Amino acid sequence: MEKTLDLDIFMIELNPYIILSKPQLGENIGSTARAMKNFGIKNLLLVQPRDGWPNNVAFAPAAGADDVLNQAKLYDSISEATKTISLLFATTARKRVIGTKSLSIFKAIEKSFEHVVNGGNVGFLFGPEQSGLSNDDVVQADYTVSIPINKEFSSLNISQAVLLICWEWNKIKMSFLKDDKNFVKINKKLKKSTELSNAGDREYFYKQLDELLTKSGFFYSSEMAPVVKRNIRSLFNRASLTHQDLRTLHGIIRSLSGTSNRT
């Protein structure tokens, strides 16, 4: 008797999180949910939606993706929403100069899918419809994602951008699942010493570092302090910090601040 594999078992484990920061229209949240469910992705996180949540106007454009909307999670900040995300991508149409590494959508999906297969959590962050993500938002991500579209008309509805991410993700997932040997790789956890740190742990480190640098007088110019802080974040994010890296950095901070327990 031919053995069949139940792909539904792996849908959650092999899916990313879609994070909408300050979405303005409930209708766009609904159409985003529809785009996600088209490709079996149901992890929707909402950060400060303008019209609040839940929002009944989202259900009509969702066209049946009610389950995605009903299980969507609401957060007060990007840092709160991404606490358990170990690899975060910020989608942006504008070229940034803040130092965050940029990848094409194709490279981003390849890298992110490999990360999920190895037990990590991946998130794709989208900004408000009119303004997009701010520099302070983008600097929280490990990478920015660029989508190759017409430079003379680069306007994408947020649900269209989500659809492209989900489409590319689904292509690589289906290709992966065609090979039975790949099933043994699913949920294979990386060793703790090499696993990428999650955004919540990194955020805690940045706060500790910020406090130490502030006390030392490092931010001598209050006008430039926000820019310098973003640059510092970008510097560390480019290093793809592991849990062990963070433990080492916390040890350095404790030593420099005189709070180390070592004698």
Regions of interest found by a model, annotated:
Residues 1-263:
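Post-transcriptional modification and biogenesis factors for structured RNAs
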